Swiss-Prot record:
Listed Pfam families: Lactamase_B
SMART domains membership: Lactamase_B (SM00849)
Positions contributing to Zn(2+) 2 binding: 76-77, 166, 208
Protein name per the record: Glyoxylase B2
Keywords per UniProt: Hydrolase, Metal-binding, Zinc
InterPro entries: Metallo-B-lactamas, Mito_Persulfide_Diox, POD-like_MBL-fold, RibonucZ/Hydroxyglut_hydro
Species of provenance: Dictyostelium discoideum
Amino acid sequence: MSNKAKIEVFPELESATGQMIIIDEQTKKCAILDSVLNYTQNNGRTSTKDADKLIAYIKENQLEPEWILETHIHADHLSGAHYLKGIYPNAKTAIGEGAKIVQKTFKTIYNLEHTFPTDGSQFDKLFTDDERFTIGSLQVRVISTPGHTPACVSYYIENDSVFVGDTMFMPDVGTARCDFPNGSAETLWTSMKKILELPETVKVYVCHDYPPQERGITFFTTIAEQRLSNKHIKDSVTKDEFIKMRTERDATLKAPQLLLPSIQVNIRAGELPPKEDNGISYIKIPLNYLKQ
């Protein structure tokens, strides 16, 4: 079996998200990772323009999606997973089993309908730590990497590439915030160290990039480069230094612009909230709840 993947990245620029297609060229099977449903907050409209780019590429290259993967319950964009599942009904939607914790937390915050399940059943598959699965002939290992959220997982194609979601970012950007409910800087440190123990030649694919002005947007680096120069987590940084930096920095951050709409859609695996008796679906906004 081959274990070299072809990766195509489709940036969604509003949320700086790197939608990805992970391809096994031997079998033409693929997985879609961290897709986006476009959302315009000032008029409450959704569109599928960026997810449609994935569909067009898959069709043009005659690929067969086996998985629609999430690295976590995103708080900065709406997931395109439900839309894509409608296009590819045989592809399995999947996320880490920690999604159940996020569902339970936000069911209470949003005061959702009593019938909303918090067992992760909106997804076809909940991965456990160290679980294995395949994309065509590619062997993939799930690495539980909580800290940013309890649901975070990374997907590791052995000796080739790892998809880390919102754990670490590009070396000049650093790491993800840990101030969401059930987040933890100490837990994130432990999770990132698991990733950084992988071989130095492994390519690291990040979910977001917020580049400084002197470079363009990009979504991959290597384990070696992260260990050498990631400004938050390079080898010379101690655990105590990281926790202090991350905690102090998080205290200054405002909530992501699309936090409130994103989570209540993404805990449903990208499906919009159920329509009410007038045929309209609504996003709920908890007033005076967030810290800032």
